């Protein structure tokens, strides 16, 4: 069985502060409530004794083509909430968690946010994908609700002072990828295949190409596709092959990546492959895909499920026992997001009986003062503009 192997931590330019992120763009309350019923009822029972609970909402796609991301975010958060409640809660208060499906759609994500507000959410873990997250930031800003996205990587996902993220931002993924490839001499000629209609993909691409000008390799082909034309990549691959590219950089999601790897193999094209966190999920998320084609694929991602540290092993064991599968980076990001929320609440001293706005003000101030050791980084800190400081890592599929 193939797996990710964390081969080393990437040390980028010493002057660079890395901010880590993940993905790019209905209220399905009955499904979300059903999934979270045990978490909510247990917290409610325990919270009744203390008179109050912290209510954390989550948003992401649990149905549709991006469901692998939203379900991972939901499940990672649920494990963190269960651990926190079992350990006595946050400053003695239990936590309730409710997750809403948005199908990775901006309008539906806003609807999901409104449903969570009606439920009484005080803090938001989400949205999962960038396009949906950007839409929700406008609403959380209006309400002054604290929002931390585990995986929304677009720059605009942290455009307001109440917005924070756990993951890499798109530009910094592109920057770090170009630097790693160049500093380690992985390729001389690189082709890029990216989705010009997607904020995640195009954001990484733009920064990668700009940084490539400073690196000892040449971008010999930059081939785009769009959401309306993402099944046949023969033209893009042929141009990469004809240009002599010995590496193809794929700042895209795993569904399209699987098609590209399959079609490249069929035409006898075998370059090195380098990607980012959007490819996480390719080993188990694509039907009828020959996973042997991923052999040697390199990913810039903050989490490896086969890492040997105690925290990762504990999380992976719990996740497999509860959900029957290996967690991906999005699950780890969301797990960390809940613990970041916990740390900010503890540092600020806010309580559940305070208004959403007062809770947010306290947590915002605390975010630049906390340090969190998590699944996706040790000694993580945050800047006032919402970005996480932590070292990126490279994983190799073998």
Model-derived features: positions:
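Hydrophobic helical h-region of N-terminal Sec-dependent signal peptides
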Residues: 12-17
């Amino acid at each position: 069985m193939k797996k990710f192997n964390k081969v080393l931590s990437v040390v980028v330019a010493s002057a660079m502060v890395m901010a880590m992120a993940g993905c790019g763009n209905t209220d399905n309350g009955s499904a979300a409530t059903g999934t979270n019923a045990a978490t909510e009822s247990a917290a409610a029972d325990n919270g009744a004794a203390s008179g109050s609970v912290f209510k954390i909402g989550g948003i992401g796609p649990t149905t549709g083509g991006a469901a692998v991301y939203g379900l991972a975010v939901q499940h990672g958060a649920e494990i963190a909430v269960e651990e926190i409640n079992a350990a006595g809660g946050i400053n003695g208060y239990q936590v309730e968690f409710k997750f809403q499906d948005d199908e990775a759609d901006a309008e539906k994500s806003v609807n999901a946010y409104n449903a969570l507000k009606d439920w009484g959410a005080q803090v938001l873990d989400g949205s999962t994908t960038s396009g949906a997250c950007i839409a929700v930031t406008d609403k959380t800003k209006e309400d002054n609700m604290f929002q931390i996205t585990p995986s929304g990587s677009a720059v605009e996902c942290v455009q307001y002072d109440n917005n924070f993220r756990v993951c890499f931002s798109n530009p910094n993924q592109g920057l770090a990828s170009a630097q790693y490839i160049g500093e380690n001499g992985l390729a001389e000629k690189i082709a890029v295949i990216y989705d010009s209609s997607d904020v995640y993909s195009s954001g990484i691409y733009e920064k990668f190409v700009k940084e490539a000008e400073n690196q000892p390799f040449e971008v010999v082909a930059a081939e785009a596709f769009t959401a309306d034309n993402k099944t046949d990549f023969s033209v893009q691959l042929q141009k990469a092959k004809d240009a002599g590219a010995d590496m193809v950089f794929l700042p895209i999601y795993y569904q399209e990546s699987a098609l590209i790897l399959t079609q490249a193999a069929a035409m006898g094209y075998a370059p090195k492959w380098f990607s980012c966190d959007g490819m996480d999920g390719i080993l188990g998320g694509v039907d009828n895909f020959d996973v042997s084609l991923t052999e040697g694929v390199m990913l810039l991602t903050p989490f490896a499920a086969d890492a040997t540290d105690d925290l990762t092993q504990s999380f992976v064991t719990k996740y497999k026992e509860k959900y029957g599968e290996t967690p991906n980076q999005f699950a780890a990001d969301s797990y960390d997001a809940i613990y970041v929320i916990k740390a900010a609440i503890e540092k600020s001293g806010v309580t559940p009986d305070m208004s959403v706005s007062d809770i947010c003000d306290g947590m915002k101030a605390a975010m630049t003062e906390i340090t969190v050791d998590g699944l996706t980084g040790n000694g993580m800190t945050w800047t006032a503009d919402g970005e996480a400081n932590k070292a990126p890592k490279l994983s190799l599929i073998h």
